[in-house]
Each structure stands twice: as structure tokens, then as C-alpha cells.
């Protein structure tokens, strides 16, 4: 859309019933109708955050044209144009057969359905280019070949390398280790932290592939990063820009602030949104007005929060416990004046264990 094209976002209401064998070592479990419908609805909602399907493009569901097809019509109108030898030669099929892993007719037929999608999108929306991950190359070329045979159309495909794990396997919900666009599956903070952990050698590639930063801007970021890699400026830029794209600028800012605090920064400047994000990540304990007015025993609070096993532990190792980043004063009670932004106080034990004391009348976002 940024380059003047009209994107068509294809939802697999039909192909989701089958399961794509590409990049898989074994058969996918079939989804029930309720799960599939929920997935399609979630994808529609998530895509709408990135593409204005009304003014910029369209969101289409392949069940609209595949659902009404009968088996006989599909075999007659589509199957007769497809060579079985070419289907067997696809990497997704050949790799399974070579390993004697086997493949059901259901998964074997998947490439025909996706190929047919390309034909239908060209007929109905004049779609000439299909863009996907590199694991979809075989399915895309199947569609290009089918469109040429059925309609004499010259279509094209563009793929990008997949982001893979250290073992070379792709990320995905069915293979484990996925990060989600949905905030209720992967929180903005967890999303931000994921990109902060990217190895130095991968940062430049990720910035180029996943952000809208210019090549010059990325080059400048990497130059600074290489001079002081311990400051992780490359990861910070990557985490900020991707979190902003997915969750918005405010969430990216709050995630960055929360991250700094959890990993050793001072919490004094935390604002309400950042505190709310922290509360959802590290846990919180609610306290009412009366408790705050009367004052709370700090040692008891650390036990109540789960940061200490007993008040004796707090007294014995007081130097390791902090309130809002400062060593705890066991002779001073904690009250409303200790709430940052009038919302919460941060309790810490060591460098990595944190808990928030939240005013009970406040709503955690």
C-alpha cells in the first residue's frame, strides 16, 4: 500500500481446514469448525490494524469460492490442468516421502487449493503478484502454472526468507516458540523483550526486513551499535519500532521504560501506563485507602508480595530489598506518598525480582 499497490489479504477459511504441509515434519492436526472460525475472525481483526482493507485493499476468504465447489467440479475444472509429477516434485511433498514420513491425500491436495486461490484472485481482483514466506514457493509456483494453463495468465511470486530458530525450524504456533500479534497472547512488554534478546549478528537483518526505517537510518543505528554493543542500541531500535508497529507508539514507549526498570533502572520517573504494564508482567498486590493512610509495615509487605519468605529474612538482608529503587527503611511505614504517579510502589528483591503495590481503587490495564 505504501508503494501504491492494492494489497489483498487472503484468509484461509478453506485451506485452514486442510493444513499446509510446507515446512512440516509431520501431519498437522485438523481444526474443528469453532476453532477455525475463531482463527479467521482473529486474523481479520489483526490484519485490520495494519491494512485499511476499505481504502487500501481487501480482505478475502478462500472459503468464499472453495466452499461451493463440488469434488467433481474441482477434479474436472482444476485437477485436469495439474501434472501429478510436478506435485510430487514439490519440496513439501518430496521431503516427507524421502524420509518415509508419509503424507495423507488431504495434505497432498493442499497445493491444488492454494494454486486455485491464485487463479481466483486474478480473475476477481486482477491480482498478479503473490507475496509470502519462502516456504510457500512451491505453492505459489503451482498457482502460477495453473493460471497459465487455465487462463493463459502470466502471474508472479515474491518470497522472503523465513525467520528461523537456531535449529533452522520456522517460528509458528504449531511448532512452538511463537510470538503473537494479539496482546492477550503476547503482551506488548513480552513482545518488546523478545526483540531485545535478538543476537547482535541478526539485528541489522531484522531491522532491514521488519521495520520501515530507511537503509541510511539503519546503517547509522548499526554503526553506533557496533561501537558499544553492550548498550544494545540496535536491539532497542528494533524492539521499539516493531512494538510501535504492532501495538502503537504509547505501548512501545511504556515497554521501553518498563524494560529499563526491570533490568536495573530507577523507577522514580515511571508514569501510569508504564506502571500498569509492569504490574501485568511482574504481578501486583492491591491495598486500600485505609491501609495506605495507616501505613504498611515494609517487611510484612515483602512477605505479602511473595518476595520474601518471612519478615526475619527481610530484616536480616535488608540491603537486598528496595522500595522504588531505594534500600528499604524498615523503620518507616509505606503509604500513599510512596505511590509513583499516585498509582503504585515498586518492591524489589535483588536485581530481577519485582512486585508492585497498587492502589486498590486503580484499574490495572
Segments from the language model and where they lie:
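NTP-dependent nucleotidyl-transfer catalytic core
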Residues: 1-136, 141-144, 151-156, 169
Amino acid at each position: 500500500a505504501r508503494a501504491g499497490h492494492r494489497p489483498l489479504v487472503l484468509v484461509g477459511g478453506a485451506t485452514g481446514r486442510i493444513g499446509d504441509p510446507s515446512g512440516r515434519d509431520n501431519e498437522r492436526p485438523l481444526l474443528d469448525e469453532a476453532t477455525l472460525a475463531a482463527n479467521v475472525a482473529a486474523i481479520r481483526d489483526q490484519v485490520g490494524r495494519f491494512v485499511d482493507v476499505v481504502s487500501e485493499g481487501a480482505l478475502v476468504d478462500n472459503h468464499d469460492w472453495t466452499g461451493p465447489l463440488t469434488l467433481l467440479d474441482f477434479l474436472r475444472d482444476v485437477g485436469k490442468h495439474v501434472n501429478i509429477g510436478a506435485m510430487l516434485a514439490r519440496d513439501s511433498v518430496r521431503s516427507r516421502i524421502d524420509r518415509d514420513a508419509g503424507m495423507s491425500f488431504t495434505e497432498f491436495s493442499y497445493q491444488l487449493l492454494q494454486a486455485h486461490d491464485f487463479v481466483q484472485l486474478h480473475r476477481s481482483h486482477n491480482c498478479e503478484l503473490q507475496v509470502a514466506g519462502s516456504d510457500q514457493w512451491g505453492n505459489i509456483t503451482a498457482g502460477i502454472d495453473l493460471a497459465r494453463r487455465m487462463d493463459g495468465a502470466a502471474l508472479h511470486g515474491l518470497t522472503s526468507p523465513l525467520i528461523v530458530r537456531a535449529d533452522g525450524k520456522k517460528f509458528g504456533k504449531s511448532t512452538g516458540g511463537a510470538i503473537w500479534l494479539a496482546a492477550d497472547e503476547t503482551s506488548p512488554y513480552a513482545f518488546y523483550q523478545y526483540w531485545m534478546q535478538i543476537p547482535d549478528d541478526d539485528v541489522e537483518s531484522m531491522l532491514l526486513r521488519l521495520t520501515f526505517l530507511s537503509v541510511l537510518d539503519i546503517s547509522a543505528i548499526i554503526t553506533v551499535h557496533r561501537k558499544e554493543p553492550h548498550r544494545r542500541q540496535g536491539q532497542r531500535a528494533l524492539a521499539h519500532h516493531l512494538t510501535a508497529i504492532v501495538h502503537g507508539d504509547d505501548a512501545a514507549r511504556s515497554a521501553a521504560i518498563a524494560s529499563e526498570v526491570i533490568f536495573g533502572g530507577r523507577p522514580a520517573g515511571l508514569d501510569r501506563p508504564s506502571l500498569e504494564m509492569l504490574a501485568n508482567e511482574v504481578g501486583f498486590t492491591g491495598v486500600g485507602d485505609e491501609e495506605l493512610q495507616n501505613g504498611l509495615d515494609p517487611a510484612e509487605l515483602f512477605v505479602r508480595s511473595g518476595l520474601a519468605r518471612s519478615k526475619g529474612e527481610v530484616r536480616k538482608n535488608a540491603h537486598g530489598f528496595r522500595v522504588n529503587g531505594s534500600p528499604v527503611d524498615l523503620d518507616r511505614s509505606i503509604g500513599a506518598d510512596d505511590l509513583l504517579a499516585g498509582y503504585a510502589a515498586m518492591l524489589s528483591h535483588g536485581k530481577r525480582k519485582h512486585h508492585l503495590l497498587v492502589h486498590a481503587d486503580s484499574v490495572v490495564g
